Curated annotation (Swiss-Prot):
SUPFAM superfamilies: Class II aaRS ABD-related (SSF52954), Class II aaRS and biotin synthetases (SSF55681). Keywords: Aminoacyl-tRNA synthetase, ATP-binding, Cytoplasm, Ligase, Nucleotide-binding, Protein biosynthesis. This is Histidine--tRNA ligase. The lineage of its organism: Bacteria, Pseudomonadati, Myxococcota, Myxococcia, Myxococcales. Homodimer.
Amino acid sequence: MKINGVKGMNDVLPADVARWHEMESVAREVFALYGYREVRTPAVEHAALFARGVGEATDIVNKEMYVFEDKGEELLALRPEGTAGTVRAFIEHGAFVEGPQKWFYMGPMFRRERPQKGRYRQFHQIGCEAFGVAEPYLDAEQIALLADYFARLGVTAELKLNSVGDAQCRPAYLADLKAYLVANQGALCADCKDRIERNPLRVLDCKVESCQPVLEQAPQLLERLCEPCRTHFDQVKAGLDALGVAYRVEPRLVRGLDYYVRTAYEFTSDALGSQSAVAGGGRYDRLVETLGGPPTPGIGFALGEERLSMILEKVGRAMPERRPAVFFVSADATGALEALRLAAGLRRAGIACELDPRGGKLKAQFKQAERVGARWAVVLGGNEVATGQAKLKDLQTREETPVALSELAARVSG
């Protein structure tokens, strides 16, 4: 009986992995320019970390998190996002004593959502977290980092920007928003009605068409920011203007996690259709303290690799992919053994090569050489081994020339 993969757990096959290598290598290059260093945290954490950090009222914790008891009866969870685990590591290892820190991560996350295009139950994120600086110009710098990253990949993405206030101005706004939503709940979808009590801010993020007339008339937090939050937001915008980063203020932009304060932002792409968000982040100045650390401001973002890969494929960006320089075509057993020896020498010299240990018809071997994208084919048999000379075929020009086996590396390394 055939066993298929688990629903929503997607395979990334070799033909697609080149895009993933490109996304990740460019991320490492760009992040290093801004002083971010890589951290690797486990995929399994205590479930309480996300209940306290992400928020018990969020859909992630309530509906989507994979939770299980291990043999020691501890309640554990597969991480649904990367920030809480990174903050936990920052606290646990005392990194706060070293002053401001800039970290980034890459890896799989897990949410039991309904699988759809660009959204899987195991998905991969690249994220940055900066700790220890509350000033708004850090917000602008981190957003510029993400804009630089997309530009390096050749991706066009629109930046949407908002402020979600803080503990000084948000409670009064939430009370007004909740009252408005309750008064108009008859025109809202079932999910929105459920969120009114648990997480009214998330109602503003609803994409259901029938809800839009109500949401368009909803109170806006931007109009009710306290003076410190207003000043912070103005300075973030000034920083982005100074850096030449274009943005659009989006008053209904909220993030789905409870820990965000003040700056919230999102990059979207038309290439994804309705699932347009490719990256998002914001400020979380009380999260470190909430998870048991000293008061430490922070800001971070995460981008979805699956969605970004879909964009790169759609825009037709050429991906660098290392193909073998040489394919050895064996005419007989003597040639196959010599091919094995020569291939080892070329690889030690840093030259990629392949051979087919099965041998077989020369025509089939040449077809395989072209299928794997080799530049050169070297034909070897007993006569070639005896004379130390072989036929070297350029698979692009179709030209054949003799080559001394002792000079093969020099001929194919150019």
